[in-house]
């Protein structure tokens, strides 16, 4: 619901380290299908590959595409399902079935032909199809594991990366800078300027905070280290909360546009104890996504366990009416309201 409400059109699964997480994406496809069946909206899906790209692409094709599973969720580009894989590594079957784009990593900040950028320094280069002057794709990232000084690749844990507070060529270390999304905002400016058909945002969440060893460093975290040096948009408890989610919403709306706000209907007096039909003339209707009261119960890191059973009532549609003396509220539920005690 969060992604669809934000205006996200396609969810790109990161399978760049060879693992495809089949159980995970299949479950998401199942849930997306259920959401659509109940009247909701979801993004389309595709995958990005890198390590052993050819084998990864073949596995994805065999498990999902060849049997035709969840066909209505496949993201289409140039008349075929899109897959981000190096054409030089792809099998003939994959080449024939998909529209291919190569993943471009931030080792070189150049515009790229038929290659989509995973991450880049501001002002970001872009990917193009045939005409180098016509952008096809640009990346917008919350933060980058790229050095503040020269844009070269670094680890998020080294202290020199372009974290969430980087902007105007420097790391902003002022109190509360993390709350403002300066880096993310700067990247969005470039996307609005280029206005390509594809803006790829990195990223919704990081699957794991990988700990590595480096020469001279006993501990190194490449992609995710702390609140500043990470690039999750997904909300957190405490800290920056849902700031980056709403910044994503703002960025997408400025890029794609948004519908005009509906006008309110004329004043009307509602007789509380009479038929609900009197609400038919009241506009606008505010709709909530269905199926969002499901209890959450899942293991976290180490011994942590996350549980939330507070969702009770499925509230679907809302209206507000007014006259000279009163304001009236209407709420339609999916099922009978649960008791207050």
Residue ranges and their predicted role:
Residues 270-341:
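Surface-exposed, glycine/proline- and aromatic-rich loop segments on solvent-exposed faces
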Residues 1-271, 275-276, 283:
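Glycan-processing catalytic domains of CAZymes
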């Amino acid at each position: 619901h969060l992604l669809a409400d934000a205006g996200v059109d396609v969810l790109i699964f990161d399978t760049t380290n060879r693992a495809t997480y089949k159980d995970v994406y299949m479950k998401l496809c199942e849930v997306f299908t259920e959401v659509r069946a109940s009247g909701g909206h979801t993004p389309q899906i595709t995958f990005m590959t890198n390590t052993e790209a050819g084998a990864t692409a073949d596995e994805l094709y065999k498990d999902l595409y060849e049997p035709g599973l969840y066909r209505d969720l496949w993201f289409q580009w140039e008349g075929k399902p899109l897959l981000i894989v190096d054409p030089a590594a792809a099998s003939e079957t994959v080449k024939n079935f998909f529209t291919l784009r190569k993943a471009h990593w931030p080792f070189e900040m150049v515009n790229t032909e038929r290659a989509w950028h995973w991450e880049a320094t501001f002002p970001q280069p872009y990917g193009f199809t045939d005409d180098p002057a016509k952008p096809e794709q640009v990346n917008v990232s919350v933060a980058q594991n790229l050095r503040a000084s020269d844009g070269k690749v670094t680890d998020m844990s080294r202290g020199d990366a372009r974290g969430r507070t980087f902007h105007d060529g420097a790391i902003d270390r002022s109190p509360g800078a993390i709350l403002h999304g300066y880096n993310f905002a700067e990247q969005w400016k470039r996307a609005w300027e280029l206005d390509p058909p594809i803006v790829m945002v990195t990223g919704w969440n990081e699957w794991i905070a990988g700990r590595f060893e480096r020469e001279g460093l006993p501990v190194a975290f490449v992609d995710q280290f702390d609140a500043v040096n990470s690039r999750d948009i997904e909300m957190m408890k405490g800290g920056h909360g849902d700031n980056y989610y709403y910044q994503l919403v703002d960025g997408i709306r400025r890029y794609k546009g948004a519908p005009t706000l509906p006008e309110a209907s004329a004043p009307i007096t509602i007789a509380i104890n009479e038929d609900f039909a009197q609400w038919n003339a009241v506009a606008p209707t505010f709709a909530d996504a269905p199926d969002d009261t499901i209890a959450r119960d899942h293991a976290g890191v180490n011994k942590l366990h996350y549980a939330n059973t507070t969702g009770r009532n499925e509230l679907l549609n809302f209206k507000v009416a007014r006259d000279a003396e009163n304001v009236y509220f209407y709420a339609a539920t999916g099922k009978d309201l649960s008791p207050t005690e």
